Curated annotation (Swiss-Prot):
Its cofactor is Zn(2+). The gene is gfa. Its EC number is 4.4.1.22. This is Glutathione-dependent formaldehyde-activating enzyme. It holds the Pfam family GFA. Keywords: Lyase, Metal-binding, Zinc. The lineage of its organism: Bacteria, Pseudomonadati, Pseudomonadota, Alphaproteobacteria, Hyphomicrobiales. Pathway: One-carbon metabolism; formaldehyde degradation; formate from formaldehyde (glutathione route): step 1/3. It is an enzyme of class 4 (lyase). Zn(2+) 1 binds at C27, C29, C95, C98. HAMAP family: Formald_GSH. Zn(2+) 2 binds at C48, C50, C53.
């Protein structure tokens, strides 16, 4: 039996459109929803199993991507947003009405500073870049998934076309390590 991973990947990956130029993310509130405008195509979209990311009801993974912080603007009902954990690297701003995480900028000194994490399934528009891998797969155990299901879940992710990792994908991990090495002087800046 197939696992319910996330509603936007359970039946295959969404299709990217070359004409997608950004759009509007909308929370789940039926009255006064929070709206966030994102300019341009998103990057590094992936399914994520961490316990920090917002997930739709019944999903064991989130779908999360990044955009440049300068390309992300709260346009309506921003007064409903509250930072979930001020000590976290990703400052996840959640709607106090429905709980959806609407945007999460990285503001501290980090390789991802200047990027904002978003959940692209909240776009009104279609055509955003689909997930390309799965991160922090083992972390779904921390949220209650039976470890005996993990081999099947990893196999299902691969069938969908999402390589499962227990960190980020190799390219992003190399980027973080390179940034850290330059910061420490181990590599030339």
């Amino acid at each position: 039996m197939a696992e319910k991973l996330h509603p936007r990947i359970d039946n295959g990956l969404p299709k990217e459109s070359a004409s997608f130029a950004g759009g509007t993310l909308v929370c789940a509130c039926t009255s006064k929803p929070v709206k966030v405008k994102v300019k341009g195509q998103i990057a590094h979209n992936h399914a994520c199993g961490c316990t920090k990311c917002w997930k739709p009801e019944g999903a064991i993974f989130s779908v999360v991507a990044v955009a440049g912080t300068g390309d992300v603007t709260v346009t309506e009902n921003g007064d409903k947003l509250k930072v979930v954990d001020a000590s976290a690297l990703i400052q996840r701003h959640a709607c106090t009405g429905c709980g959806v995480h609407m945007h999460g900028p990285v503001e501290r000194d980090h390789a991802f500073k200047g990027l904002t994490f978003i959940h692209p399934e909240r776009f009104v528009e279609d055509g955003w870049s689909p997930p390309g891998f799965t991160a922090f797969v083992s972390s779904i155990i921390e949220s209650g998934v039976d470890p005996k299901r993990m081999d099947g879940i990893r196999a299902q992710l691969r069938t969908i076309g999402l390589e499962p990792y227990d960190c980020l994908n190799p390219g992003l991990m190399d980027y973080i390590a390179t940034w850290t090495a330059k910061k420490s002087g181990a590599l030339p800046a």
